[in-house]
Amino acid sequence: MMLGAVDTIMLSQYSDNAVAAVGVVNQLIMFAFLIFEVINLGTSVLCSQYLGAKKQKNVVQVVGVAILLNLVLGLVVSAILHYGAPLLLTLMGLRPELMVYGVGYMEIVGAFAFFQALSLTVSASLRSANKAVYPMMVIVVVNILNIIGNYSLIFGKFGMPALGVEGAAISTAFARGVSMIILFIILFRKYIPKFPIDYFRPFPFVELKNLLKIGLPSAGENMSYSLSQVLLTYFINMLGNEALTTRTYVVNMVMFVYLFAIAMAQGGAICIGHLVGEKKIRAAYLLGKYVMRISILVSLVLSCIWALMGHTLFSWLTDNAEIVRLGTVILFVDVILEVGRAINIYATNALRATGDVNYPFYVGVVVQWSIAVGCGYLFGLYWGWGLVGMWCAFLLDENIRGIIFVRRWNSMKWAKKGFVK
């Protein structure tokens, strides 16, 4: 996620059209990466609960099965993204002047998607064992590496050729490869030194079943959201290049707002999973409430700062007056949206950690498609409110789901959904 944002920011100094094209590509790639989340979400929940119950053998089995499955999935997805780039971007309605940027970027980044598949799996395993500091350190190192690579390859510095968008793609793919290697070294040295063969004879189909039982509905909610965003990006593309470019800038800006909510939710989910494994249900409930309050407060403060700085930020990124005007307005609308997003990020992670994986999926599918997509089309295209109208629909979607999830957490119906007996 961060690598794509860095690419967008640095390409803003290269071409607004390049930013728009890469924004569409990253939406497709993020959707593809959610396929890996089927396994990763199950890995995180199971490892957290097994560690809470002191069942180390089961932890090793879960991690081993997860790595194998995501390697296979990663190779398949890599092939689809690389060879299917022109077709997929044509289906997204990408204009000819943007296609040259989009295809080149997608073919390179997509070809190495399996790097991300394995990195996400190892990161989920480490975080569930209270070793989140290692993935965080790797992210910092890799982003610095990507910034240096982008600067060198986009603009032709340090004796490198000026490759533009393809340079950004090469830098991103290389950074993800380095990330994967470092994470595996940490996994073997700090967490699981080896995977004993006898742990996998016979193959632990029970753990595979549990991974899919948790992962399919959990990733299904994420995939529903991402697919709805792909369709909404198609709608925004119909509004023109300026709207599409503005959307790309805003999405990457506000990501820095909700990163804290993601970090709090992931850390809280690990602790909640451990508490559920230890049968400390009341403590898990109170921790979830605390995480939600902190996430909302920080997201609200950061989104207000972003809104107040909006004109300055957009003026730095582009000299297109319409993009600056439109983006500044949307950042103010986004302030209320981020409150609902913070609740959703906390609630979906917390409910999954307890084993209550179906409820977020059902709510997500119904509300995302009826409100975000339905109202997005109605407000943005049918009524002619444009990109601001679509952002109002996103605001309604996030906050309606947030209210529903808070009621679910307070009901305590998740308390009997754990997988460790």
Describe the function of each predicted region.
Residues 2-3, 32-36, 76, 80, ...:
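Residue-level hotspots within pore-lining transmembrane alpha-helices
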Residues 8, 19-79, 116-135, 233, ...:
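Small-residue-rich hydrophobic transmembrane alpha-helices
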